[in-house]
Amino acid sequence: CVLDCVTSLQNGADMIWIETEKPHVGQIGGMVNRVREVIPNAKLVYNNSPSFNWTLNFRQQVFDAWSDEGKDVSVYDRANLMSVEYDDSDLARTADEKIQSFQADGSREAGIFHHLITLPTYHTAALSTDNLAKEYFGEAGMLGYVSGVQRKEIRQGIACVKHQNMSGSDIGDDHKEYFSGDRALKAAGEDNTMNQFG
């Protein structure tokens, strides 16, 4: 990987992209330092990959660090750190703090120039669709959509709440009005349901 990065930078690339098997700042920094021995101003793009189990990786990193420091970790089973029973533990809170600071730590300590997540909307769309389906077809019924989606769009000022505008119905109305004048049957207008959103 390091040789490929150096070769790419020597042949016109302005940034490098590396992949690691886990999100570990020390490992990433070690790779970047080796590249910078040859290309001192190398810029790294790092994929904060959804392929990583971030929770498990950081819980294991904290477990290992605490163990190396001589801290008592006997209440934790390293092979089972994803267990919900650990979610409110000191180890889990420390791991979450490390996840929260990963971008800043990676930039400072590993020389990451740009962080990205590949396919984040694939995961957010799947999760939100699954949650909506459970609510809508479950006990909440239509309230599952209203409280879980529409009301949040309104409160957060998300333009998609006016989906008719977002899908271009106003553009279609402009064309209809151009060709039919006042007789145009438009999707918008004072009776349009979208006007309920202000």
Task: Describe each region flagged by the PLM.
Residues T55, H123-T124:
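A SIS-like phosphosugar-recognition module
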Residues G157-D170:
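TerminUS-proximal long segments
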Residues I117-T121:
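Short acidic/histidine-rich active-site segments
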Residues G138-R151:
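Polybasic, proline/glycine-rich intrinsically disordered low-complexity segments
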Residues C1-L116, T129-D130, K134, A140, ...:
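Alpha/beta enzyme core
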Residues I154:
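Acidic, glycine-enriched catalytic cores built around paired aspartates
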